[in-house]
């Protein structure tokens, strides 16, 4: 009992007297996050009041982690992304496609894009592959990481592309990710 009391007293002395400044500084830390918003630009007119540049309404599709399945639920995430991709393609909308991989007509996976983008894809934060990994190695690692088994190669690449974009842009509660810009009102209504 005396040993336990002595140990507790020593810890209290260490926290309250010896390392007081360190623990006080840790107690006073603040956490904050920044959300960037694009401001609307006003109309630009000439000296006579004639419009040179006007505003128009545009829609963006933004994924927000608060309303998206958790990282553990890859199957549900993939289903949502698959449905969004089908909707975008049906309505001929463009969406984020930054994955530096493509599938050729013969079905082979090839690199596409800049060397820096390919190196980023292979790094430890993304697919965690060695620099000498082939395009097929990257594709297979993407399928495994995002659990995209069960889809054909072309569809898996499209889903993997959006999942890669979410990872690349650090998708989280504080950081929503835009996957499509300037989409039609019809597409927004369908979502």
Walk through the language-model features, giving the residues of each.
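Membrane-proximal periplasmic segments of bacterial cell-envelope enzymes
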Residues: 1-191
């Amino acid at each position: 009992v005396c040993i336990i009391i002595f140990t507790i007293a020593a810890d209290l002395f260490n926290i309250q007297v010896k390392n007081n400044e360190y623990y006080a500084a840790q107690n006073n830390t603040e956490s904050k996050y920044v959300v960037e918003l694009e401001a609307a630009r006003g109309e630009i007119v000439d000296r006579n009041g004639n419009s040179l540049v006007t505003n128009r309404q545009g829609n963006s599709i933004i994924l927000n982690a608060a309303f998206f399945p958790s990282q553990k639920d890859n199957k549900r995430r993939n289903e949502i992304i698959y449905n969004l991709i089908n909707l975008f393609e049906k309505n001929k909308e463009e969406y984020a496609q930054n994955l530096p991989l493509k599938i050729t007509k013969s079905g082979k996976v090839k690199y596409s894009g800049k060397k820096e983008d390919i190196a980023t894809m292979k790094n430890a934060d993304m697919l965690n592959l060695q620099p000498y990994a082939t395009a097929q190695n990257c594709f297979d690692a993407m399928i495994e990481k995002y659990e995209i088994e069960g889809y054909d190669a072309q569809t898996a690449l499209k889903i993997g592309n959006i999942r890669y974009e979410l990872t690349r842009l650090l998708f989280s509660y504080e950081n929503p990710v835009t996957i499509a810009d300037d989409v039609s009102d019809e597409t927004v209504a369908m979502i």
